Each structure stands twice: as structure tokens, then as C-alpha cells.
């Protein structure tokens, strides 16, 4: 199970809402199963309404910041702005290049946003839900 502090949950939801109707994307860094930092990335996909592609310079800057903070990539997030109960699309599965990362998907298709977590295996072409918990913020 992965722990997501309330403030990071709110940052991810806020990023998804800011980018809507386009998909948002970003990384989550931390240690072990505790997330510490959200790294919003720009979506430069040619069709941002239905897919995402992180801006390479944003991706490199986020990875550099993670190294400097002693963090590892724990999760990748993006949004499905019209989905009430998001699941990985065929494109999400095909482009899942980080098999050890958790993939968070934000659905904004209902009154309240829905955040779900998955492990995705691009080699096997499948995905499975992952449990996560929203934790009270702590001073780290």
C-alpha cells in the first residue's frame, strides 16, 4: 500500500482541475511507500484532450530534483477529465514504461474527483488496482 499525504492528494487534484479539459500529468517522489513530493509536468501531447506526454525538460528537471532530495520515483499521475471511475486506457498500458511505479489516474467526470491507483505491465498488457491511503500531513 502507498501512503499519500492529504496535501499531495490535493496538489494532484488541483493540477488535474487546472488542466481540464486537457489531461494533466506529473510524477510523485518519495521513499519506500511514503510519497513526499508532487512534480507537476506540462502535457505537450498533440491531442491533450485524450492523452498525455510529459515535456522532456520538465521530466528531466523533476528527476534531477528527486535525486537532489534523495527521493525515488514512486508514482506517475495523469487525469481522465471526463471519467467518473478512471481505469488505464489501452494507450496508458502501452506507454507504461515504469513497471515499479504506481500509476495514479484522476477522474473528473463526477461532482467529486476520483483518484485510483494501478500497477501497469506494458509487457503483459495488463493492469491491476493498487491500494493507497490518504494520510494526515506530517512535517518531514
Predicted regions and their residues:
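Acidic/histidine-rich, metal-coordinating catalytic segments
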Residues: 79
Amino acid at each position: 500500500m502507498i501512503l499519500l499525504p492529504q496535501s499531495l492528494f490535493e496538489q494532484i487534484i488541483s493540477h488535474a482541475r487546472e488542466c481540464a479539459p486537457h489531461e494533466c500529468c506529473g510524477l510523485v517522489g518519495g521513499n519506500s511507500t511514503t510519497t513526499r513530493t508532487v512534480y507537476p509536468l506540462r502535457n505537450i501531447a498533440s491531442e491533450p484532450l485524450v492523452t498525455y506526454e510529459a515535456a522532456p525538460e520538465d521530466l528531466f528537471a523533476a528527476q534531477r530534483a528527486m535525486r537532489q532530495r534523495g527521493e525515488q520515483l514512486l508514482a506517475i499521475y495523469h487525469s481522465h477529465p471526463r471519467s467518473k471511475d478512471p481505469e488505464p486506457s489501452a494507450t496508458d498500458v502501452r506507454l507504461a514504461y515504469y513497471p515499479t511505479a504506481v500509476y495514479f489516474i484522476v477522474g473528473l467526470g463526477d461532482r467529486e474527483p476520483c483518484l485510483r491507483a494501478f500497477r501497469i505491465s506494458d509487457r503483459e498488457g495488463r493492469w491491476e488496482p493498487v491500494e493507497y491511503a490518504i494520510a494526515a500531513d506530517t512535517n518531514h
